[in-house]
Design a protein with these regions (language model features):
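Charge-rich amphipathic alpha-helical interaction elements
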Residues: 1-138
């Protein structure tokens, strides 16, 4: 029984770790998206300041070109993180399923132990009743 409790605690810990990993990846994606939006605003501001909106124009601001590159890198990184997020969610689901299996086994064992205990108690009560009946005690 003790090993089953330890196993349940281990599975709960694993589920918590997977949840933290999912939350961490989601946070990183949100940060990248926020930074990308900030860069887009900076690009727009720089384009308005220079009066040039075409990145291929020879006088296009260097800062805007660099910001576009950073924004693209952030977008690419966020896309890669989304793939990792799907994998992490899948692992979380598997860990949760494993936890549920162990918990169900534990519940089944506890129910069986309760039934055995009830059967022993009933047998004891039956033997007491039988002895009283043999002795003629009412």
């Amino acid at each position: 029984m003790k090993s089953r409790e330890t196993l349940i605690r281990l599975k709960k810990f694993q589920v918590d770790e997977k949840r933290r990993r999912v939350a961490q990846i989601e946070g990183m994606i949100a940060d990248f998206q926020r930074m990308s939006v900030d860069l887009e605003r900076e690009i727009q501001t720089e384009q308005e300041r220079a009066g040039i909106n075409d990145p291929s124009h020879f006088a296009y601001p260097t800062y805007a070109k660099a910001a576009i590159q950073r924004r693209e890198n952030l977008t690419r990184s966020a896309d890669e993180l989304r793939i990792q997020l799907e994998d992490a969610k899948s692992l979380l689901g598997e860990a949760f399923d494993e936890l549920k299996k162990v918990e169900l086994l534990d519940e089944r064992d506890q129910a069986r132990e309760r039934a055995e205990e009830n059967a022993r108690e009933q047998a004891d009560l039956d033997s007491i009743g039988l002895m009283r009946a043999r002795l003629g005690v009412a």
